[in-house]
Structures are given as C-alpha cells and as structure tokens.
Amino acid sequence: MKEYRLTDFLPTTKKELDLRKWDKVDVILFSADAYVDHPSFGAAVIGRTLEAAGYRVAIVPQPDWHGDFRDFKKLGKPRLFFGVAPGCMDSMVNKYTANRRLRSEDAYSPDGRHDLRPEYPTIVYTQILKQLYPEVPVVLGGIEASMRRLTHYDYWQDRLRPCILCDSHADMIIYGMGEKPTLELCKRLDEGYNIGDITDIPQTVYLADSNDVPTAMGTTDIVLNSHETCMKDKRAEAENYRHIEEESNKMHASRLLQNVGRKTVVVNPPYPPMTTDELDASFDLPYTRLPHPKYKGKRIPAYEMIKFSVNIHRGCFGGCAFCTISAHQGKFITCRSKESILKEVRQVIEMPDFKGNLSDLGGPSANMYGMGGRNKKACEKCTRPSCINPQICPNLNTDHSKLIDIYRSVDALPGIRRSYIGSGVRYDLLLYRSKDENANRAAAEYTRELIERHVSGRLKVAPEHVADNVLRQMRKPPFQQFRDFKRLFDRINGECGLHQQIIPYFISSHPGCHEEDMAELAVITKDLDFHLEQVQDFTPTPMTISTEAWYTGYDPYTLEPVFSAKTQEEKLRQRQYFFWYKPEMRRDIERSLRALGRGDLIAKLWNNTQQRPTLDMTRHKSQQAKNKNGNNRTTDNRERPKGQKRRPYRNDR
C-alpha cells in the first residue's frame, strides 16, 4: 500500500499551500461535499484535470457560510477564477425527502452531518464570493447548476425559477461533465481574455443583453419561450422542455436562447462525447482514492459506498423520464479502455482494507459498456432521447462481449476474489433479440455470467411500476419483461444451486400514476412474493421530463394532459400500497380500496392470511442487516410450481 503525504492531495488550507511553496493559486474550487480525492467526486476530477494541465488548484470543502466568511478568505484571490461545485447531488435532494422533511444524514459529509451545507450552495457561495471579491470571475459547475441552466420548476419553493445565473450572479455555468470546457476556459483566461467576452466555448451558459446576443458560430439557434411567458403559461414551459432534452442528446445540437427580463440566457451546445483516450486520461489522474487526511477517523457514507467500486463508462441511453443522467452526461456511451480499468482495479487491490471483493464494476447503467450505434451517420441525425424506448433502436449494437471480457479480465487479477455488479441492470437489453446472432449469444452468456459470478446474493433491477400506462410515462419497458427476466433469473439460480434474490425498485406518485395503479402494483408484487423495501415517492427534480409533466400537467412531447398526485395526502395514499404486508397498514388500505370501488382487491391481498411462524430472531436480524438493498425476506422469492416447498435461504457466497 502506498503511503500518501499531505502534499499528495490538492491543498485545502494556507498551511498546505506553504508545504508546496505556493504563494498563490490559479483556481480555487468551493465544494459543498467533503473532499474525497476520487474520480467519483466532481471537485476532485476538475481539480486533478487542471493540475495535470499545469495549473495550481486548491479546494475549499464545505466552507462555513456564517459569520465572518473566513473560509472564503483564507486562500485569498485566485489568479483566474473561483469555481463553485456544490456537490455530487442536488443540495435540496440531499437535504430533504420527497415530503420536504429534513434528512437525518448527509451522505457526502463527515459522519453524515447534515448541517455542513446550506440550501442552494451554488447561490450562497457565489453571493459571498461576489461580495468579497467582486472583480474575480465565478464559474458554476456540477449537477445543481447544470440542471438549473434554464427556467426550471423548483419543488421545494413550489415555483418556477429562472436560470441560476440570475439568482447567483455568477459569470458562467459549465454544464455536464466539465473537464474539456474548464480546460478551455482556463486557457482563454490565461491568454488575457475577459470572461464576459468568452461566448463560444461549448457546454457553457452565460447571460447576454437581449439586444446584443453574440452570433452563433457553426450552429443554429432555438429560441425558447421566455421565462416570463412560462410563468404565465404552463403549456409554454412544457413546450420548452422537449427542445432542452433533444438538444442535450444530439450529436450536433443547436444553441438555446431564453429571454429573462432584459437578459438572454445563452446555452452553447455540448462538446462531442469524450473519446476513450480522453476518458482514460481523466480516470488515470493521480487520485489517492481517499478522503483528505483532515477527515481521519470520520466516516463519509458516500465514500464507503464507492470505496471498492470502479466506473467503466460514461453516458446512458436509457432515457428514463425521471433521471437527470442524459441531461448531464448525454446518451452516447464513452468507454474506458480495458487497460485503464485494470489499472484502477490494481490500485483498489493495494488498499489496506480491501478483502478481495469489488462492490461494483459498472456505470450509470450496469450493462451498456461497448454499446452504441452501428451506423454513426444515423446517430448524427437522431433526435430520440432514448436508444431503447419505446423500442430498442435497430441500429443499436447490443453486444455484451466486451463487457464479459472486462469482467473476466478483472476476476483474473491476483487479489480479486469476486467483482460484484452494484449498478442497475437493464434487463430489456438482456432479453432483446436482434438480427445479430452473435450479440444474442453474448446476451445469454452475459446473463448467466452475471447471475453465477457477479451477484452478491441480491441483484438490483428497476421495473419502477407494473402499470403499462405509467411505464410509458417513465420510458420503462413493459412489466412483462420483468416477469420474463425474473423467470430466467430463477431458472439459472435453480440450475446453479443458488439462492439469490432479485431486488426490484419501484416509484409511487409518478406522473400518470393513479391510486388504482398502485393498488394493482400491490397485488402483482404480492403474487410475485415480494415484500418491497426499495421504494421511493417521486421527487420532482429540476430538468427531467417527469418533473415538467408533474408541474405543468402536460406531456412535453404530445402536450396531452397528464395526471399527477400532488398533495401530501394523495402521495401518501399511493405510497401506502408498497407496504400492504405490514399489519398496521391494512385498515387504511382497505378503506382506500373501498373508496376506489376496488374492494375486490382486498381478497387478493389478504386471502388465506395466517399467522406467520415465529422467526429465529438472531438469524432474522442478521438477514435484515445484510438486506438493506431491498426485499425484506428471510427466504428466497423464486417462482415455484404449486405445492413445491420453498428452499431455505442461503447467505451470500
């Protein structure tokens, strides 16, 4: 194990600058997350990228925004700009539940403390910096700013908000994965350009006077409905989102313009997807993969989750309506080379507390590595936000062969016992049968490889609902495909003598979901022998099609009306059906079903109910502790022929 010195981390204090003999830095990054020097943490990625290009970079993690602002003063002024990177999650999702209740833990803070970040740190940090150093440019990045780059609905304020540049008074947003635009910005500022004159860097957002918008270079413009129009007309807001989503996922996107008062928000098209060499260069930077030494003895929950995981690609072509990944990373997959992946795995193997098991070898989705369009010219003209919904594109290469090779190459390394897959598996890709028989054989081979060797007892998948009308709104495959995959999963388990569980994820209160749909979900999952635990109430987050439908009441593509459960009472009534098996929920559910006129479902949920036998509580508690990911069962939930007894559950191999 390599011993790291304090100077192996990016500096966070004046003392650490002195150790490097630096009297000044080029860029200072302010982050609302703890500083973890790991490629899964955005501030570390940008900091290491700039460092590799020869710039001096410092990070101020979780500054105190109260009192005399000493954390904002301690490193002085940077030569080029302040970067505000609020964190890996939207701050309001991080702090509050779907019912707007304060969360008890912040996964990105030491010991899970929830008082170390403000609401909207993008705005709070920027306003402080502008107050202290009005002449120094402030550049925003990260998920919070990226998803608020245009007029958006804010669930926690329950109103539309303009581009976050208007509220924060920052100079620029770098949206999405920011290595390339950040490097280009540094280069321009280094050459003496004023940030107000830099208007042509891809993947940036800035405000211009409405009567003096710079001419687009090499692209067309799409003029969106103004912020003021959207405030008055929800349909206009819905119309905007179709353009926003399409331009976020095109090979050759248009520039977006939106008027806000006397200003115009200008969103430049994104950079093309990174090449494999470029992505390798980002992941191969000298990360220590450790929290900064200032956190010694403290637990950072998010780091513990990804400590022994390795990311193998960027991008996701699933296009799920409630997900921000396509708007942030795009739908085109960029893969790391096998050599780069193995290099990082070897680094994990050297960690002193690594016991031989990788917790995840995946990405935004588990099984999209190596996939993309066969005919690239067709992809260049494509406007679909998803390559697999409503049907899998016939141009998509769904061959899993490269991914199988990655798994086997990793498992062959000395020091690796098992590599598990913690990312969500797209079972629709596994079930799909194309005209390419080699790809079909690889899908079958991958499915067996996955279940036999890469499941740590429980496999996570995300059907999200059972009602096809809701699944269409979510852009998820029909529920029958989940049934088909579960049957395949159970068959392979039986053939291999395994006793694994499949853990389905579900969402309530999604646009298009009525209470009766949730009642049907309860009955169907009960018939499949699930006691659901991995569930969530839909939370409207900025810049997703689901949020736009929830707020406006319109489908942004068809402009047809869409129902959404909005009041807390409606949302709780939908959520209760997840927990039909809890005795304390039965009376309320029965009352709700009768009010719906669906008393027939009562018998389906509780027919032949009998007292469960007393469990061995020692074993039961142990099982519950292991089973934080979902189905709270003490036995496996495979489908069995009538009359066949359930096999006893066996712990993880």
Region roles according to the model:
Residues 30-35, 298-324, 357:
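N-terminal pre-triad scaffold of radical SAM enzymes
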Residues 42, 61-260, 267-268:
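Glycine-rich beta-alpha loop elements in corrinoid/cobalamin-binding modules
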Residues 90-99, 147-149, 179-184, 211-213, ...:
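Flexible glycine/acidic-rich beta-alpha junction loops that bind and position SAM and/or redox cofactors
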Residues 27-31, 73, 201-204, 296, ...:
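Flexible, glycine-rich loop/tail regions that form catalytic "lids" or insertion modules at the edges
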Residues 2-24, 34, 235, 239-309:
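N-terminal [4Fe-4S]-dependent radical SAM core
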Residues 29, 45, 59, 65-68, ...:
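Conserved SAM/AdoMet-binding glycine-rich loop
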Residues 171, 282, 316, 320, ...:
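Conserved, mostly hydrophobic/aromatic
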Residues 66-67, 196-249, 262, 271-274, ...:
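Terminal amphipathic helices with adjacent charged low-complexity linkers/tails
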